[in-house]
C-alpha cells in the first residue's frame, strides 16, 4: 500500500516548481490531485501525470475562483484530504523604493491567496472529516535576508502566523496546519537549474553549501500529509539546507 492511497489533494501553483514536484510525489504515493494554476500550465501537469490529476485554472486572489476550485475537487473526487497552498510570487526592491501597487500585488498573492486557500480549505476539510493544510511560507518569513525582499518577507511571516492560528483553532476538529519554509530552492521563480552558480552568496549561507531541489520539498510535503505525521501540527518547518541555522 502506498503512503497516500485513497487521499485527495488540492495543490495551487501546480503548473511549475515545488507545486508540480508535489503533484508528482503525491501521485507516486497513490493520491489523486486537483492541480490548480493561473498560467494554464496546470494542463501540462495533468498531461504528464495522467488520470489521477484534474487541472483547474484558478487565480488564488479571487475568492469566487478559490471556492470553485474546492467545488471542482469535490465534484471530481468526492472528497479532499489535503490542501497545499503553494502559489506565490517573488518581488525584490529596496524597501524605500517599493511602490504601493507592488506592495498590494505581493500581499494579494502571497498572503491573501494563502488565506483564501486556508479558509475555504478548512471549510472543505471539515465536511470530509478533517485533513491537512500545508501553507508555503519561506525562510524569508523567519529571518531577514541579504536580498531586498522586505514585502515578500512580511507576507511570508503573515503566512506563518495565521497557519499557527489555524492549527490551534481547528486541531480538535481534525485539521492539522503546517507552514513549510523553503530556502533557496532551484525553481523557475529563483532562476531555474544552475541558479546556485548565479547566486553563490545564497549557497554559502547554507550549511550544505548547495541549493535545494523542488523534489526535496515535495518529499516533506508527502510525509506531512500522510498518517505517519498525525501528531505534527502548528509547526514551522524550514527546508533550507541549514540556512536558518547559520543565521540563528
Q: How would you name each of these model-derived features?
A:
Residues 138:
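Residue(s) in the substrate-gating loop at a strand-loop-helix junction
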